[in-house]
């Protein structure tokens, strides 16, 4: 084991307990910042139609996941198809052809490494 690895493990051991205590407080106890952000969060939830105290079933979670993935797939496909017309395209990259665009977007969505 190298000197760098030993230092890394020692650092992990030293910060494990303080970091664990901090995370416990951050997730399970009300803090000062919650008084500021809770009303803002409530407004965002109300406008979005989210019921924050209601847990999702597996069916509603799966539906939400599929809807978000479909939306991201559409947005990504659209961006890659019109990239030539977008501002800040300094390299003047041309639009991708449809099948290559679809392949690229699906590989991003599924985290596929096509090498």
Curated annotation (Swiss-Prot):
Quaternary structure note: The system is composed of three essential subunits: KdpA, KdpB and KdpC.
Matches recorded under InterPro entries: KdpA
Family under the similarity heading: Belongs to the KdpA family.
Function: Part of the high-affinity ATP-driven potassium transport (or Kdp) system, which catalyzes the hydrolysis of ATP coupled with the electrogenic transport of potassium into the cytoplasm. This subunit binds the extracellular potassium ions and delivers the ions to the membrane domain of KdpB through an intramembrane tunnel.
Transmembrane segments: 8-28, 60-80
This protein's name: Potassium-transporting ATPase potassium-binding subunit
Highest rank taxon of the organism: Bacteria
Keywords: Cell membrane, Ion transport, Membrane, Potassium, Potassium transport, Transmembrane, Transmembrane helix, Transport
Organism this protein belongs to: Geobacillus stearothermophilus
GO CC terms of this entry: plasma membrane
Main location: membrane
